[in-house]
Amino acid sequence: MSDTLTRLAEVLEARKGAAPDSSYVASLYHKGLNKILEKVGEESVETILAAKDAAVSGDSSDLIYETADLWFHSLVMLAALGQHPQAVLDELDRRFGLSGHAEKAARPQT
């Protein structure tokens, strides 16, 4: 895992027990999962809008900024649910070299 993801995962874990007024992440944890999920949704929309703007303008700076926000809040969500970023990287590794059609066909039917 990248050093950045490792450091971020450590910070997110450390903030779980912190006072809500000590950091933004601690305040999100204190507000609960619904607030965290709301932020993930908000950042998803902002990322989509930034992608549309980048396609028109050719300037990807807002896209990169909003994608970083989306990834960050997704990592907060994972941490709040007791998951580590490595689990996502492991899943991506598992899929590497696997056709998207084959992966989809192998999913359990619901």
From Swiss-Prot:
Keywords: Amino-acid biosynthesis, ATP-binding, Cytoplasm, Histidine biosynthesis, Hydrolase, Nucleotide-binding. It holds the Pfam family PRA-PH. HAMAP family: HisE. Pathway: Amino-acid biosynthesis; L-histidine biosynthesis; L-histidine from 5-phospho-alpha-D-ribose 1-diphosphate: step 2/9. The keyword Iron-sulfur does not apply. It catalyses: 1-(5-phospho-beta-D-ribosyl)-ATP + H2O = 1-(5-phospho-beta-D-ribosyl)-5'-AMP + diphosphate + H(+). Its main location: cytoplasm. GO terms for molecular function: ATP binding; phosphoribosyl-ATP diphosphatase activity. Belongs to the PRA-PH family. The keyword Electron transport does not apply. GO terms for biological process: L-histidine biosynthetic process. InterPro entries: HisE (IPR008179), PRib-ATP_PPHydrolase-like (IPR021130). This is Phosphoribosyl-ATP pyrophosphatase. Its EC number is 3.6.1.31. GO terms for cellular component: cytoplasm. It is found in: Cytoplasm. It comes from the Bacteria. Gene3D superfamilies: MazG-like (1.10.287.1080).
